[in-house]
């Protein structure tokens, strides 16, 4: 049967907590004081198998949590990179529904405990010349060339913006970098993640979600400047395949296994992997990387994965 089209809210249902998982063989202990891991989930051959660890943040203890829904974690190592770091690791996240707001948590270990930044939201919905219903889906990109963190986020859903900071806490707004005006017939351009091009020096790549006619796909953009000159090509996209629930979003570039892979979530509720090549000109759907459990805490949905590697162990944060 043809999958029933999902609304953006349906695609985001269940996005009420941030989870953490680690590849099999990693530390099997609590994260942020949460319970021990459940059994590991099967993965695509050649890719790691992840085991659920826990929730890095306790929603009930957060000072800023207007919607009781936290999405799109972006975890970055900041020690020795940003000015006066609060911890060795920063995690950016956000509520989605209005008013949203980009938030920060910090920790000395990737496994926690994670602490909420007392000044959250560090980027509100009304700020630096724009006034929108919400801002959300933060992605942090540390640029060694100028030693600044560039934070990409959306607000409204048709616009992706960028701000930068030397300390990762106080940001300067630059401008919008991507919008639906760049993709005819597409109604959303959001949930972006940015990374250096795997083979071309001085080129940056963006993976983002676009919504042409109710079927969300992953599009590719590129630029020579982090804050401007972004280009999107409608023909370069990753569309949902059979078994993916008719929708895809939340893409992360997978540089391991020789690179050229994209990890993303689908309307099926699982996290999938596809081979796109280092030229982003292929589309080979490989299967499920992480199969969300039907019971708590996943409740049949895992999404927006963010990966960090520490001492040979790969950790996945997700919503």
Region annotations inferred by a language model:
Residues 1-6, 34:
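Secretory targeting signals
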Residues 26-47:
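C-terminal segment of N-terminal export signals and the immediately downstream linker at the start
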Residues 4-21, 40-319:
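Carbohydrate-active catalytic/glycan-binding domains of CAZyme proteins
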